[in-house]
Amino acid sequence: MAGSPSRAAGRRLQLPLLCLFLQGATAVLFAVFVRYNHKTDAALWHRSNHSNADNEFYFRYPSFQDVHAMVFVGFGFLMVFLQRYGFSSVGFTFLLAAFALQWSTLVQGFLHSFHGGHIHVGVESMINADFCAGAVLISFGAVLGKTGPTQLLLMALLEVVLFGINEFVLLHLLGVRDAGGSMTIHTFGAYFGLVLSRVLYRPQLEKSKHRQGSVYHSDLFAMIGTIFLWIFWPSFNAALTALGAGQHRTALNTYYSLAASTLGTFALSALVGEDGRLDMVHIQNAALAGGVVVGTSSEMMLTPFGALAAGFLAGTVSTLGYKFFTPILESKFKVQDTCGVHNLHGMPGVLGALLGVLVAGLATHEAYGDGLESVFPLIAEGQRSATSQAMHQLFGLFVTLMFASVGGGLGGLLLKLPFLDSPPDSQHYEDQVHWQVPGEHEDKAQRPLRVEEADTQA
């Protein structure tokens, strides 16, 4: 391994060069392919003689604002629990999301809205891009503290492409319904990140174990992320559902599911906690599992009771996962899941997909009436039975797991390339490796950073 000067020079050049290249290439592609859609273009909109009040901006933008806040504030602050990694948690979330939303606009545009030689964008494409960024940030949670920014940008470059392809296969080729992304966002993002983490397994991570925990104020800041996500999750699930009853029902189901998952989390956390005390890790994360578990079925006729039951189940399963399964995941399967994305997004995402299979299989014309067309158009048109739709939903889950697993494996191999800057084993979960930290000179005088230390990878 090169010594400190060459390593510092490489770190100085890698990130700016990659950022400039990615932004430059994206800008060129935007110039060539991206155009306003008919609801955004001045000439096209006014030529159609619509009232301004009919523009989709007024129906979709409030949801977009909520989704945007979730991505940049909710996800960012949820990950600041690490005692010495707050700058990186929020800062790299900012960086990844800013790149992912541009790149996903292109990838999703080529797959979903490419006609006349151009990609046509509007507020719905902004929401879809944020959804994709959310999946990338979920994967980031699995490798938080163990990767550098250049590695993360390359991860996003690959993951956005696979996310777009998986989404296209599920929604357009298989006709799967997944309004809130239990499969396309949460399951995909979680298992992509978990497989990536397995490939990047660091057997000497014990050297940084003392930084992997939280302190009082870092947990408090992380709780800000939890509250933002909890408040805005109904908008997240409902952002792109059919206007009217469908969107209303989606928000309602998510609202009740989140409430039930919160009570389930508090109950289980106290039950399995030491001396009956609550664990803030459980509250920060498992309380949100209710939003994940109804992602697929929230626009369906789940019923308020069904939403409560699903949320409570997700909260309990997620809490038990944090308590018992995360240690097994690392010790037995060599998956170092920093944020526990398997418990918040992975297992609840799979449960949500299976719940969607069940609710889709129970769909009838009597239950949905004329609303069947907006929720299950293929059933309404007579092209599928409810049972067939349920089977397609189940197959969509397997397709998602396949794309996520293969993609995570490829991503891990990409990120292990020796010339990419990666923090040494003794400096994981440490902001000073990548950031100018206030007071770092005094800290270095006591504990100098050994940036020249060789990396150890399996």
UniProtKB/Swiss-Prot annotation:
Catalysis: reaction(s): NH4(+)(in) = NH4(+)(out); methylamine(out) = methylamine(in); CO2(out) = CO2(in)
Protein name: Ammonium transporter Rh type B
Native organism: Homo sapiens
Similarity-based family: Belongs to the ammonium transporter (TC 2.A.49) family. Rh subfamily.
Tissues in which the UniProt entry reports expression: Specifically expressed in kidney. Also detected in liver and ovary.
Any one of the GO BP annotations: ammonium transmembrane transport
Region feature (Interaction with ANK3): 416-424
Membrane topology term: Multi-pass membrane protein
